[in-house]
Amino acid sequence: MSGKGSVVLAYSGGLDTSCILVWLKEQGYDVIAYLANIGQKEDFEEARKKALKLGAKKVFIEDISKEFVEEFIWPAIQSSALYEDRYLLGTSLARPCIARKQVEIAQREGAKYVSHGATGKGNDQIRFELTCYSLAPQIKVIAPWRMPEFYNRFQGRNDLMEYAKQHGIPVPVTPKNPWSMDENLMHISYEAGILENPKNQAPPGLYTKTQDPAKAPNSPDMLEIEFKKGVPVKVTNVGDGTTHSTALELFLYLNEVAGKHGVGRIDIVENRFIGMKSRGIYETPAGTILYHAHLDIEAFTMDREVRKIKQGLGLKFAELVYTGFWHSPECEFVRHCIAKSQERVEGKVQVSVFKGQVYILGRESPLSLYNEELVSMNVQGDYEPVDATGFININSLRLKEYHRLQNKVTAK
């Protein structure tokens, strides 16, 4: 063992973390490479060989896809989580899941350090490190992109490319096409390079999870999605009878259907927690279908006033996830409250997936608050129309008083 001890590096096999692996060895650390299989398209055995060739003492490949869906994506679906009204939080949800396993490995291997390749300007450094400090405060974090001896040596990607050539590090990225991609089961993100100019449109061929909606099939897929306690438990393709009921298989199937129809693309400028705006392009196929389907069954089954409170909690949940506070007491509290709100969110939603869109076709539930007789225009039911007169009069009092004062002020 070297003098500085062992460090568990969150390793992707890409340019940054490959260079960081070699650099950490230069600094005197024994490097344990940790690859999280979280649903990305990756040759993990090839990545293992690469890490060992670059000098990793050990390599751990951990499949965390199932726990990612059940413990992180499902709470986000229950909460209808959107950051700044558009972002479904694919990367934000993955980071605490990845970091949790990294901490487990560090504790198991007796490593005093963990490390990551997140930049000093982004959100991921915060998400990784807040998770580490929450779960294992005794473990120290090595963040090369915040260390002067690293970032002064590597001013940008070209310096990393040169370093890679010098040390025999094979990397697929070239200076001509250097935008960053980050993929997991839920989504893929694209940023940096020519995308940093928010005016530039996404280059042809950039998207990898979804078909161009204009080239998508000319007939839709009709799906029935069943929910219990706000969580999808079964999906059925009405056309061909395909059915999936385990969390991971269900999610993968929805990714396939949504991707085929070009569902889930967004191009946004968002506010990073650290204080700057950034441009990101995202594909979130299955997450987009489930967002719309869950929203529909929730509105069908949940009391109006409870839902108003829950919507506020959902906004807070999205903010906490985005800013890295998954393991905070307030986020645990919010998740608990949202789970409570979902106890009666049960039923089936029929959707059409077609050329980039998700259309709600119908819904049914044994726990619905919808009363067809009460709302009918043809049946009076347990409702006296004359009662609406008093209801309107009472609600108009506040408006009358407000405008009486406004008229008095204007008259002056």
Curated annotation (Swiss-Prot):
Q: Which residues bind L-aspartate?
A: 119, 123-124
Q: How does it assemble?
A: Homotetramer. Interacts with NMRAL1. Interacts with CLOCK; in a circadian manner. Forms tissue-specific complexes with ASL, SLC7A1, HSP90AA1 and nitric oxide synthase NOS1, NOS2 or NOS3; the complex regulates cell-autonomous L-arginine synthesis and citrulline recycling while channeling extracellular L-arginine to nitric oxide synthesis pathway.
Q: What are the annotated GO cellular component locations?
A: cytoplasm; cytosol
Q: What is this protein called?
A: Argininosuccinate synthase
Q: Which residues bind L-citrulline?
A: 87, 92, 123, 127, 180, 189, 270, 282
Write one Pfam family the protein is assigned to. Answer: Arginosuc_syn_C
User: What is the recorded function of this protein according to its Swiss-Prot or TrEMBL entry?
Assistant: One of the enzymes of the urea cycle, the metabolic pathway transforming neurotoxic amonia produced by protein catabolism into inocuous urea in the liver of ureotelic animals. Catalyzes the formation of arginosuccinate from aspartate, citrulline and ATP and together with ASL it is responsible for the biosynthesis of arginine in most body tissues.
The entry assigns this protein to a family as follows: Belongs to the argininosuccinate synthase family. Type 1 subfamily.
UniProt organism field: Bos taurus (Bovine)
Q: What is its EC number?
A: 6.3.4.5
